[in-house]
Amino acid sequence: MPRFLDQNSPQTFNRPVLFIDFEFTGLDVNRHEIIEVAALLTHPPDFTITNSYYAKVIPTHLESADQKALEIVGYDPRKWQDAIPLRQMLLDLSQLAPSCILAGWIVQNEWNFLIAALLAENLPFFFDEKLLEVWSLAYAHFRHDPNMLRLNLKNTCQALGVSVDRHKPDSDIRATYEIFKRLIV
């Protein structure tokens, strides 16, 4: 588990928050891989976006991919011609957001895949052990709303008037960020 033991790392409420969304070849961290990433770097107290990142990642084990997952994310080898290696994406993120707190809709998925990828590439953790899960904030907000029958990104966006193009990480993460801003800031 990543931990900041260095006393020079920023205090919790001063750390940058990296809103992050991955698309995967499936949801099993032991068999599947990250193939697309979008991230928004924000800084407290108002969580202004100071930088962003987007990349397609070269899949190396398509034989173990879940075909349904590939359909959902729109995987097409022609669209991945400019994809970068996993290691490069990890280095890019670590340079973009050192000492950050990860945030996302259900950010535990990204957390699990990110830890596995960093370990596989023998790279250090660049993020804190704390997570900001926007789904949990939405749950607290909508828990008594009789119109919210299923709490997911699409329904939450509709309820809050946020636009989203599902399973496109750049759209998903911007929508997640907008939901966060509307519920917290």
Regions found by a protein language model. Give the residues of each.
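Conserved non-catalytic scaffold segment of RNase H-like nuclease domains
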Residues: 2-112, 153, 158-159, 167
